[in-house]
Amino acid sequence: LPGPGGLGVRLAARLRELIRAGGALRPGTVLPPTRAVAAEFGLSRGVVVAAYEQLAAEGFLAGRQGSGTRVADLGAGARPAPKAPPPEEAARPGVPDLGGFPRGRWLAAYRQALTAMADGDLGYGDPRGHARLRTELAAHLRAFRGADASPDALLVVGGAADGLTLLADTLAVCGRPRIAVEDPSSPRTRALLRRRGLEVTGVPVDGEGLAVDALREPGRLGAVLLTPAHQYPAGVPLSAGRRQALVRLAREHGVLLIEDDYNGAFRYDREPPGCLQGLAPDVTALLGSVSKTLAPALRLGWLLAPPAWAPRLVHDRALTHPTGHTLDHLAFAHLLHTGDYTAHLRRTRRRYQSRRLHLTTELAAAAPGFTPLGTPGGLHLPVALPPWSREAEVLAAVRAEGYDVQGLGACALTPPPPDRPGGGLVIGFAALTPTAITHLVGVARAAGGPPSSPGAPPPPG
């Protein structure tokens, strides 16, 4: 299997070529089981599974229960494969592989919800969300995120940003409008907090996450917002020592810790660390959603509130959102109950791990001086640029090709001058094909490499 990238990437590329050429792999051809392929070619089964899943997500393969994996019919009469997101959305940090959304499982769950729901479920219901989903979600968070979760403490919200808006409004009404955020962090999140009337102050981030010792005047803080599982954009987890120090500070000064469990489900070198809320449920509000694991369009998330905050949050939620999207709640509860959601997470982890590996391999081979940062996890890769390049020039080049890569400078509370040498990129890789990854890296290298760098490769076709 010659060519760039890891074994899974090369196997997928070879199968893709054979399918396009016709011959032995014609539409309807049943592929050998993954175990058989792995044994015949001396590969791990995980490599073969990742290659099959990659091609299924691209529309080259199709699978049916009990009939194996087949070459999809790509002829004119075939059902068109779901369209891939445009390159600019695919490269945006945090965008999942939307082609991998489990449409069949979701449709089956939706039908089951419609069939089984009681007439009363069509009413206004509980502002916290349907009890069945809160029960299933609490069990999932206990088992997979180490949370101290009960159904009564959970609110089902319209995504993490919706839950953060509820918390921000409550902080403002309670006269605690000062909030500390990580520096660097998401510019959109900071804009949301300011829009809700909060005073935002920054706290530096290093290799261990948020620098707790740098928190100034903690007695004046209402809350600290952080991403401890996989910091955005630096990609580092909050260390155990920092977690303990932050919890002590929160309890001593009455500070609410708002944990955005950003990318908490995705770690590729080991099991992801448990959530901070499991260590300190009395002072931590946990935010999560399915925007990264399933699709942003579902607008499904959760807020696990500390006991002292739950009554006020439920009261405020009832004023603006007296009920949720019950059908979606029941469908997601079905996915959780049957194990389909956790199976989907396992599949997507393998796929994203393969794409991240392809990106880091391409950077190492084709872009010397471009240094990946952070731990192996999440849906984005922070990359430090070499000192001879300029972030603004590299961003302009990749965006001109349609890739909405973000700059590290924009994530700082005080952005650096645009002509500053070096800088960095934040590349969303989860929805990029291997061909697009190779092209993007080539464009970035041509714009940010040494003066003698060759030109960029042609765009993927």
Q: Predicted segments — roles?
A:
Residues 179-181, 258, 406:
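Short hydrophobic beta-strand element within catalytic cores of glycosyltransferases
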Residues 120-253, 265-267, 271-285, 352, ...:
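Conserved core of the PLP fold type I
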Residues 76, 184-188, 409-414:
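Short, polar loop motifs at secondary-structure junctions
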Residues 106, 286-349:
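Conserved core segment of the aminotransferase class I/II
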